[in-house]
Amino acid sequence: MFFQIYGETAGWQLLGWLLVFAGLVVMNEIARRSKAGGIACFLILPAALSVYFIAIYVGAAMGADWALNNDTYVHMNSWFHYAKLYAATAGCIGFMILKYHWGKLGKSHGFKAFPFIIVAINILIAVASDFESAVRAGSLAGGWWLSSEGVWLYGGWWNVLNGLAGILNIFCMTGWWGIYSSKDKKDMLWPDMIWVYVLAYDIWNFQYTYLNLPTHSWYCGLALLLAPTFAAALWNKGGWIQNRANTLALWCMFAQVFPLFQDASRFTTVTSVYGQGGIAAAMGSSMPTIAEPTAQGIISVLSFAVNV
């Protein structure tokens, strides 16, 4: 099994997944259906959170206990989380500019390249993180290393292979000059984002989370990837990349403020790499003594293969 879902917490883990999936689908609809929803989600909310994050780090620099013990500061302090949050939010804002034809940018044919650029940047952020894990592991054969957030990661050749798959995925994007707004202005449509590309992207990105966010992947890997795909398949065909950006940005905001939902609650779910050690091994004070990377290797091979 890819995830450790069993015992007394299994019901809560499944419930948590359903809540995250449904919540992301609903929030995406709020953000995409009106200007007010989009502005609230991707301009007002990120601005307020930025003030909150700055206050935390200023407080921590001054030695304030409330800041040093803040969940965001303790559990979500890596460069990756902030880079992903703001890159995804930038994508959402850019997509709204195109969708609503705001200003000269929104009416410019040249700005249609923006979605390709911002998606490529988001992919490269993850690729850099994958390569970092391979280096920090100390051996391509596999090795444990402790992240800045206190989670043990098992890096190795699977990170390198998945990183290469991410680079290939960038070159799989085509047709951005054909991007246009739907007649009702609810969606920015990228017709060339067909199911073949979505499948390749989803497998690659799921593997990224599986390798590098093993305490979050059940939610940010599985639920977060299926929510935009579900919506695009059923009611806003061609709008997958917009759905993906919206749900990613919203999830990053939630996870940054409420990290214990994934890290230390009855909903916490970890991958199979920790073996019998489970959650205790993932966030323990000492290096895990068991590693089961079989699933990591298999998914990386699949990720590379589908992107080739």
Q: Residue spans of the language-model regions?
A:
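Hydrophobic cores of alpha-helical transmembrane segments in multi-pass inner/ER membrane proteins
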Residues: L15-V25, Y82-Y100, L161-W176, A223-T229, ...
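Membrane-helix interface "capping/anchor" motifs
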Residues: E29-C41, Y100-G110, A233-N246
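Hydrophobic alpha-helical transmembrane segments and adjacent interfacial helices
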Residues: I44-D65, I93-H101, F116-S133, W195-L211, ...
